[in-house]
A protein has these predicted regions:
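Charged interaction scaffolds used for protein-protein
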Residues: 1-9, 13, 24, 29-38, ...
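Short, hydrophobic/amphipathic alpha-helical patches that form generic packing surfaces
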Residues: 43-54, 83
Length: 109
């Protein structure tokens, strides 16, 4: 199950999360999660705004993430956003437990 964060702002609930497509979109725009600790201010704003794209794209157009950031974010959210951002990549390397359709491979060096 995909990890999400649900927030309420101005009496409206928003679901934040990432998909392969939204991570790809952020990478194409120049975001690199490996630089998050070197550029924390930019990274938290980019991650927070990007987390709206999967479920709440209209909110980004209406500048809702910017309004929320101006009011402040919980410190713990930075780590959770990074964890959620990495989830689609981790999912690529997981295979189903039933064995059906799983890739079989062998490396020779």
């Amino acid at each position: 199950m995909a990890k999400t964060i649900t927030i309420t702002f101005e009496d409206r609930k928003y679901t934040l999360g990432f998909t392969r497509d939204t991570v790809r979109q952020m990478e194409s725009a120049g975001f690199n999660v490996n630089n998050a600790l070197d550029t924390p201010l930019t990274s938290i704003e980019t991650l927070f705004t990007g987390a709206f794209l999967a479920h709440e794209g209209r909110a980004v157009k209406n500048r809702i993430p910017e309004k929320i950031i101006k009011n402040g974010l919980p410190k713990e959210m930075f780590g959770k956003l990074i964890e959620m951002y990495n989830e689609p990549l981790e999912a690529i390397f997981e295979q189903g437990d039933d064995g059906e359709g799983n890739l079989e491979w062998e490396a020779q060096f």
